[in-house]
Amino acid sequence: MKIAIFGGSFDPPHKGHIAIVKRALEELDIDYVIIVPTYLNPFKTSFQASPSLRLRWLRKIFLPYNRVKICDYEVRKGRPTYAIETVEFLRRKYAPKKLYYIIGSDNLPTLHKWHKYQKLSHLVQFVVATRKGYKVPKKYKMIEVHEDISSTELRIHPKKRYLPPIVAEEIIRFYRS
């Protein structure tokens, strides 16, 4: 089995995340994309939408995708979880022949600061989803995504056109309340 892990806060999930998943399924030789929402990103101090709410939104959004799995491992941990922990868990669970880890290009400047980065880089092949304003070095496999959407911006100004229709109204109500 070959899998790609796509971790993130998804606070909120948006059409850019869907575009990344679709491109990964099209361009990578994989059986599944496993989406792993964080409980709390180790580089952040808080979240707005609760982990269980973000998990529920992701399950609704990706229900029609038979090659996408939503993994609640980090949410169940109830604490910030390092990528290396999740990778080791998923390696034990699936024993993949190939393991990709999808990140946004905005993560590249701090990737070397990830917990046990050297070990992690030997266990996975990083795949970088492009984002406006960030260059991707040639050493990385790249997924071109032409969505200029920011979860940070959507928390402040939720806009329906950037949100998955199945959860758009719910997300807008949540962030406007």
From Swiss-Prot:
Catalyzes the reversible adenylation of nicotinate mononucleotide (NaMN) to nicotinic acid adenine dinucleotide (NaAD). The keyword Aminoacyl-tRNA synthetase does not apply. CDD domains: NMNAT. Coiled coil: none annotated. One of its GO terms (biological process) is NAD biosynthetic process. HAMAP family: NaMN_adenylyltr. Keywords: ATP-binding, NAD, Nucleotide-binding, Nucleotidyltransferase, Pyridine nucleotide biosynthesis, Transferase. It catalyses: nicotinate beta-D-ribonucleotide + ATP + H(+) = deamido-NAD(+) + diphosphate. Belongs to the NadD family. Pathway: Cofactor biosynthesis; NAD(+) biosynthesis; deamido-NAD(+) from nicotinate D-ribonucleotide: step 1/1. One of its GO terms (molecular function) is ATP binding. This is Probable nicotinate-nucleotide adenylyltransferase. Its EC number is 2.7.7.18. It holds the Pfam family CTP_transf_like. Transmembrane segments: none annotated.
